Amino acid sequence: MIITETRTPWINNLGDVPATLDYFRGSMYEAVEKIAQKYPEYIAYDFMGRSTTYKKFVEQINLCARALKAIGIREGDKITICMPNCPQTVIMFYAVNLVGGIANMVHPLSSEKEIEFYLKESGSICALTLDQFYHKFEAVRQHVDSLNNVIIASIKDELSKPIKVGYMLTEGRKIQKIPADAPIIRWKEFFNMGSRYRWKYKVHKEGKDPAVILYSGGTTGITKGILLSNLNFNALGQQIIATNPMFRPGDRMLAVMPMFHGFGLGVSIHSMLSQGGRCVLVPRFTPQSYAKLLLKHRCNF
């Protein structure tokens, strides 16, 4: 496409920002995999004192993708991710993309009625949530015919031993125990399924293919599902970096906006992870923790 100053007079004010970009046409996972091959030892994300490299992150995604195939997930299936910003959320999101599924992103503080609506509206056959939100899914599961599997993760599974002890003595002790015979798959058990899966699991998707369902605010009525493509997010990532010429791979983003939010997923997570940035995952915002993380990680964004 030839861009002329007559048709686009604003290009004279762009400075070093290019007038056009050559957009990556693959999937969101492939964008992350591509940057991981370039910077394997760079840190992809930090979470409560633990850091994970791009190399390890891609390995986690692939293991999760194999686990999804092991429980019967097929291309085009919808998987609800009802989680705060934590490692399991990011891993599952890209694993769903890798197997050709569509991630249905839901606010974990949604009411039971809202969760039932999101599950039915999307036709989700699988859901991932935290142990502390298990009761919501248990309450609505019998009303959602499509839902075959509920995977339960726990914040404590991603913590170092000293921090885990503190967590279990404070926040962790408030979480209601899940019955031993509950029809769920624990995150660790789920990953073990992936390690035993030996068949094909990767599905190539193009930019135009659907990848994510986000939900509108519902200010003018019932909330609406918004279907977004791989290209929507890959293009956003490239645009964000192109308009920030001072960005360098390894720069840090304090990812406090949640992944069920368009800005949180598109800018805080995918723009960083598709361009070699480092995400400091924040599961819950408080002014005190936010200030501490800013000082500790010296975040650029």
Where are these regions (language model features)?
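Short beta-strand->loop structural element characteristic of the AMP-binding/adenylate-forming
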Residues: 80-82, 89, 93, 97-132, ...
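Structural core segment of the AMP-binding/adenylate-forming
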Residues: 98-189
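Conserved AMP-binding/adenylation subdomain of ANL enzymes
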Residues: 234-252, 260-301
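Conserved pre-ATP/AMP-binding loop-to-beta segment of ANL
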Residues: 176-215, 222, 245-252
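Conserved structural elements of the adenylate-forming
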Residues: 58-63, 192-197, 226-248, 256, ...
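A short N-terminal helical cap/helix-turn-helix that marks the beginning
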Residues: 2-5, 21-44, 59
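Conserved AMP-binding/adenylate-forming core of the ANL superfamily
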Residues: 33, 41-86, 90-94, 111-116, ...
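Conserved AMP-binding A3 loop
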Residues: 53-55, 202, 211-235
